Amino acid sequence: MGPKTLVPSLLCACGLRIWWTYHSLWDGGHGSQLHSHPGRWNQSQIGLLVNQSHDVTQTSGIPTSVK
């Protein structure tokens, strides 16, 4: 094990540890129960809600806010 092989492996190990720590912190701070990017999940949920309300206004012909 010369310094040429030791240094890259140490750098790789440190990089992996930093990456793992960052991701575990991100998961802990942003709802790890979702196991996905929270922004993407919220966007899809909002999109579903918008589509549902849009369908309601189209089928009834009356905007839901006017009721």
Curated annotation (Swiss-Prot):
Organism: Measles virus (strain Halle) (MeV)
UniProt protein name: Putative uncharacterized 7 kDa protein
